[in-house]
Amino acid sequence: MADQLRTLPKNAKVIYEHCLKQIPNSLSQQDLVEAIGASISVNDLSSALNILLSRRLLDPLRQGNVLVYRAVRLDEAKTVSTMEGDEQIVYSFIKNSGNEGIWRKTLTLRTNLHVSVVDRCLKSLESKNLVKSIKSVKNPTRKIYMLYDLVPSTELTGGPWFTDQELDVEFIENLKKVIYRYVHSKSFPPKKAAMGPDLVWGPEYNGYPTALQIHNWLRSTNITKVDLSLANVISLVDVLIYDGKVEKRSDGASYRAIRVNNENIDAFTESPCGNCPVSDICDANSRVNPITCEYLDKWLN
């Protein structure tokens, strides 16, 4: 394949080398004119592009209504050159789907090939470790195809919260507990028996953690082997906020834990009846009774 590069006309070689540097980005003909300059005429540029396309060193793509070109590495071009025509078509559509992949049914519709031909091509490409099939957490019955060496998008895998296409509730709950304990440790002074458990920091305290600090702390402790992104950590803190365990401070960046009351609450004392001064004469057959009690009615509603 290196011989093919050496035998390229000068203009085609210049264009190809420039496109290689832009991978994974694509370039329009106008982009090439602006990058290479006036050294190549429009006619020579078109001829060079046709040569590169014929040797499968460029992939033609569309971005809206604009035709663009993306370089194909030499080793991949060599692999593609050994494929049959139908295989090349199927491979091209799978490649262009990126890490979002493409559903087998969609692939059949877009290639306009018979389903048996598509299946044969897929089987061949999988046997060569050029493409792979994965399952989507949103549509577990669908087979999604993408290039073999690509990492599926979180839209397909569900990100770190899913294991084998199942929501890992235990993993999420354990991480929430760990993060809450960390935020709590930064939100209140150490307990001192003589001063009681409800100590708080003064207004000058600036040790409340940000999402980035929580993220860095998680990574430094190796609590989990799963590589969590900053966005993942923020989503967990948001859940803790909804749970009423953490609040975002007025600075908009740091977080403070909310003390959780773990004492057992007597449901009777929480109701109006537990504090009613005439509860001893309240009776279903009395003038003071639960049916006509406006306080109990409001509390129940």
Swiss-Prot record:
Location relative to the cell:
Nucleus
For this UniProt entry, the molecular function terms from Gene Ontology, in alphabetical order, are: DNA-directed RNA polymerase activity
Q: What is its main location?
A: nucleus
Of the GO CC terms on this record, one is: cytosol
Alphabetical list of Gene3D superfamilies matching this protein:
Winged helix-like DNA-binding domain superfamily/Winged helix DNA-binding domain (1.10.10.10)
Q: Which InterPro entries match?
A: RNA_pol_Rpc34 (IPR007832), RNA_pol_Rpc34-like (IPR016049), WH-like_DNA-bd_sf (IPR036388), WH_DNA-bd_sf (IPR036390)
**Record has Nucleus as a keyword:** yes
Q: Which GO terms describe its biological process?
A: transcription by RNA polymerase III
Q: Which UniProt keywords apply?
A: DNA-directed RNA polymerase, Nucleus, Transcription
Assembly, in brief, is:
Component of the RNA polymerase III (Pol III) complex consisting of 17 subunits. Interacts with TFIIB.
Q: Tell me, what does this protein do in biology?
A: DNA-dependent RNA polymerase catalyzes the transcription of DNA into RNA using the four ribonucleoside triphosphates as substrates. Specific peripheric component of RNA polymerase III which synthesizes small RNAs, such as 5S rRNA and tRNAs.
Family of the protein in this entry = Belongs to the eukaryotic RPC34/RPC39 RNA polymerase subunit family.
Q: What protein name does the entry list? A: Probable DNA-directed RNA polymerase III subunit rpc6
